[in-house]
Structure formats: C-alpha cells, structure tokens
Regions:
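Short glycine/proline- and aromatic-enriched beta-strand/turn motifs that initiate or cap beta-hairpins
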Residues: 20-87, 247
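Transmembrane beta-barrel architecture of outer-membrane proteins
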Residues: 25-27, 63-67, 118-122, 165-169, ...
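Extracellular/periplasm-exposed beta-strand and loop segments of Gram-negative cell-envelope proteins
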Residues: 38-63, 86-118, 147-165, 173, ...
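Predominantly the C-terminal beta-signal and adjacent terminal strand-loop region
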Residues: 197-247
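Residues on the lipid-exposed face of transmembrane beta-strands in outer-membrane beta-barrel proteins
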Residues: 30-32, 68-72, 123-127, 141-143, ...
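Solvent-exposed loop/turn segments connecting transmembrane beta-strands
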Residues: 133, 164-166, 189-200
Length: 248
C-alpha cells in the first residue's frame, strides 16, 4: 500500500507541474526531518500479557522520516487531500524483566530487537470556515487507515502483533499570516473514544518563498493508542519537521 501511495503521488505531482492550468487548484506537500519516541507502552494481549516499554525498557533510535500530501481545491471553500505517512522505529536492549508478548515468553535479561510500525494513509475533506487575507481556518473530517505492528525478536524467539484498521478523525487547519512572508501554520487530526484516542498535530512557522511556494519549520507530535481486550498500546512520537508546499 505504501508503494502505491508513493507512486501515485509522484505521478500526480509530475502531471501537475507540466500540465497545470491557471486555476492553481492543486497543492503538493513534502515533509521530512527527525523522529524520535517519547513513551511507548504495550501489553499484548491486554489481559494476560506483560506491560513493557519500547522506549524505557529498550532504546529506540531516532531516525529520518518523510510524509507526502497531495490536495485538490474543489472550489474556494472545499478541498480534498491524500496523505501518505509511513513510520517505523527500531528498538534494542535487554529486557529488565520477563515479558509475555502475544503468548511468547521472553525471559528476563534477554537481548531483543523491537520494531514499532505505524503507517498512516488518510483522505481529508476540508471546509474553509474563515477566509480572510491573513487568516484562514479550515475544518473537516479525515478517514484514516492505520497499518500498525509491534514486534519483538530474540536469537531464538520472535513474536509480533499487526493491526490494520479504519479510524475517523476530526480535522483542523489554521494559517495565520503575520506579514506578507511569515506566519503561523497549525494542522491537526484528532479523535477520542472509550477504546482509545489519536492526535496528530503540527505547529510550524510558515515562510512564503513565493505566492506559490511555502517553507515550513516546526514541531509535530503523534500521540494516542488503544485500550481494548486484544491490545494495550499508547505512544507519544515527536517530530522535528521541515516541509515544502507547492501550489499549482
């Protein structure tokens, strides 16, 4: 699925560059930077499994990341966008206590490698609620497909838990231009329910390089998880983000 989104993004972006008309309805966005983990606690299964921390019991290595988004303005106030946001973090260390993970017992002091994957594919609808020269506020909804996995691997043991599911989210975007060149950019997808919660928030400085090109620097976090019979997992992921947005 990830390869499909990447290829589709490149094809559509290339077509926009060479075949765009004067309407300038398309926006292509590329974001990248460094990602690292805050808390990342798991117990699988929720009843009978052992609570452990991928970020405290093991060491998670920070790494580079990227995200791709393509958007199309249906009209002045209505917009659709597709987001491809892959994420895989690696952990390693020795378990400070025995861990029962998906029915596999990893003894105390076992050297393990851990994997945390949380790929996200999203379709977002935005409505322009406020449209002023220096202030734009969009609200809407996001349909998210979550492709997740937590895995532990030792020399003679291995176990993993995968999950693919649909998550409906509320969406918000705020663009506040302080000057003709510099402003604030806030974007968020979020939802909460009895079974868990999800938040993906970006707060960035927005620098207009030209009327069609924006450069962004900021902080993003992804937080949330699920507390259900099958899985307990909550994580806080931090991003140091830089991005470019091109309007065609």
């Amino acid at each position: 699925m990830g390869k499909f989104f990447l290829i589709a993004f490149l094809i559509v972006s290339s077509g926009l560059i060479w075949g765009s008309g004067p309407a300038r309805r398309w926006t292509a966005e590329v974001e990248g930077g460094a990602v690292f983990s805050g808390y990342n606690d798991a117990r699988i299964p929720n009843v009978g499994g052992t609570l452990f921390s991928l970020s405290e019991d093991l060491d998670i290595t920070a790494k580079a990341y990227y995200r791709l988004r393509i958007s199309y303005a249906l009209s002045r106030r209505h917009e659709l966008s597709l987001l491809y946001a892959p994420l895989t973090l690696k952990a390693a260390g020795r378990l400070p206590a025995a861990v029962n993970f998906t029915g596999v017992l990893f003894p105390k002091d076992t050297a393990v490698d851990g994997t945390y994957t949380f790929n996200s594919y999203r379709l977002t609808y935005r409505y322009r609620l406020v449209d002023k020269p220096r202030l734009r506020l969009d609200v809407g909804f996001t349909a998210k497909i979550r492709d997740a996995e937590i895995a532990l691997e030792a020399p003679s043991l291995s176990a993993s838990k995968t999950n693919v599911g649909f998550v409906p989210l509320l969406h918000l975007r705020l663009v506040w231009d302080w000057t003709a060149k510099l402003g604030l950019y806030l974007e968020a997808d979020a939802a909460a329910a009895k079974q868990g919660r999800a938040e993906d928030v970006l707060l960035a400085l927005n620098w207009w390089l030209s009327p069609q090109t924006q450069l962004r620097f900021g902080y993003r976090f992804v937080e949330g998880g699920a507390d259900v019979d099958e899985v307990y997992n909550f994580a806080w992921i931090h991003y140091i983000a830089a991005g470019l947005a091109f309007v065609f």
